[in-house]
Regions:
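HTH-adjacent hinge/linker in prokaryotic transcriptional regulators
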Residues: 1-60, 71-80, 93-97
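Conserved phosphate- and dinucleotide-binding cores of soluble alpha/beta proteins
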Residues: 2-5, 12, 87-172
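Alpha-helix/helix-capping structural signal
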Residues: 65, 86-87
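Generic beta-structure capping elements
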Residues: 20-22, 64, 102, 134-135
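Short glycine/serine/threonine-rich phosphate/pyrophosphate-binding segments
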Residues: 66-70
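Short, hydrophobic beta-strand segments that form beta-sheet elements in well-ordered domains
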Residues: 59-61, 80-84, 166-168
Length: 172
């Protein structure tokens, strides 16, 4: 997988790989566009996911529009939150939550913090729960994202979680 990824033939993701040939697999949609899609489904998913958080939890919140909607429903102020999304950190802070933002490169299109520094920073955390977005889901490839720098952050964050939840609507 690593060799094929280095050649650009596939994109490595947690649990597998995705084809690198299609246009949709090589580009991220702008966050402002993604936040307008499938609002009702994301609201149902987000409300359910937020209800899984307990006071004693140490929670990782991945960047993305589905997790952004989830934050609207988070009420647990006793939990501790870590994220790789500046917008998520700001929303949590406004709600009175204690939040940490990992370091790294800020990616303009998705507003996610990515890169080697982000991956390295995640190593010091051990989360009870993690909530993740995805660009796609496939029975063969698993969960996919078109950007290797985001995939590596997701992979490391998932490794650091006791329980992982992927928030995905039917369009994935």
């Amino acid at each position: 997988l690593t060799t094929l990824h280095q050649r650009g033939a596939l994109i490595k993701v947690h649990g597998g790989a995705a084809a690198a040939e299609s246009e949709t697999m090589t580009r991220d949609a702008d966050l402002s566009l993604r936040s307008t899609l499938n609002k009702e489904e994301k609201a149902v998913i987000g409300k359910y996911a937020a209800g899984l958080i307990r006071e004693e939890d140490f929670v990782y919140l991945d960047a993305g529009s589905s997790v952004d909607v989830m934050i609207d429903y988070i009420t647990e102020t006793g939990a501790l939150y870590v994220t790789n999304a500046v917008s998520h950190a700001q929303k949590l802070l406004k709600k009175g939550m204690r939040v940490f933002l990992i370091g790294g490169e800020l990616k303009a299109v998705t507003e996610a913090i990515v890169g080697a520094e982000a991956v390295e920073g995640l190593k010091k955390y051990h989360f009870t729960k993690g909530f993740f977005g995805t660009n796609g889901a496939d029975a063969v490839s698993g969960y996919t994202t078109p950007d290797i720098t985001e995939a590596l952050v997701k992979e490391k964050a998932m490794q650091q979680c006791r329980k992982c939840y992927v928030l995905a609507d039917a369009s994935k």
